[in-house]
Amino acid sequence: MLQPKRTKFRKMFKGRIHGLAKGGSDLNFGTYGLKALEPERVTARQIEAARRAMTRHMKRQGRVWIRIFPDTPVTSKPTEVRMGKGKGSVDYWACKVKPGRVMFEIDGVNDEIAREALRLAAMKLPIKTRVVVREDW
């Protein structure tokens, strides 16, 4: 699964996800892409599950680009532990996704396979998405 090799700080504030994606809202690599329509935290496990669903449907043909990276540590305290006594330890890594962000791109397969692969990937994610197609061909 994806996670940073090293970070400046071990733990991070929760924060909020405001506004639309400034960058990463256009297709840069592939012909088909999966674009987020709402703000949400996407975990490294969800990204990996979506990637596996896509590559499995494409039968190892074509190419998949993952345009998001889980760089936010999410902490949690163990079960049945009282409040206080500091912040919990890092449980998993997540990526804050804003609306308009292209998360995955596909190329090298036909239209039907690409759309179905992206639909299967979208099922694994906790947000509403839309399949986008490059128009300048």
Curated annotation (Swiss-Prot):
Which Gene Ontology CC terms are recorded? Answer: cytosolic large ribosomal subunit
Query: Pfam families, per this entry?
Result: Ribosomal_L16
Keyword Nucleotide-binding in annotation: no
Disulphide bond pairs: none
Query: Mind telling me which InterPro entries this protein's record contains?
Result: Ribosomal_uL16, Ribosomal_uL16_bact-type, Ribosomal_uL16_CS, Ribosomal_uL16_dom, Ribosomal_uL16_sf
Write out the GO biological process terms.
Answer: translation
Give GO terms: molecular function aspect only.
rRNA binding; structural constituent of ribosome; tRNA binding
Keywords attached to this Swiss-Prot or TrEMBL record, sorted alphabetically, are: Ribonucleoprotein, Ribosomal protein, RNA-binding, rRNA-binding, tRNA-binding
**How is the subunit organization of this protein annotated in UniProt?**
Part of the 50S ribosomal subunit.
Query: What this chain does, per the record?
Result: Binds 23S rRNA and is also seen to make contacts with the A and possibly P site tRNAs.
Q: PANTHER family this protein is in?
A: 50S/60S RIBOSOMAL PROTEIN L16, LARGE RIBOSOMAL SUBUNIT PROTEIN UL16M
Family statement: Belongs to the universal ribosomal protein uL16 family.
Q: What is this protein called?
A: Large ribosomal subunit protein uL16
Whose protein is this, by species? Answer: Ruegeria pomeroyi (strain ATCC 700808 / DSM 15171 / DSS-3)
Classification lineage: Bacteria, Pseudomonadati, Pseudomonadota, Alphaproteobacteria, Rhodobacterales
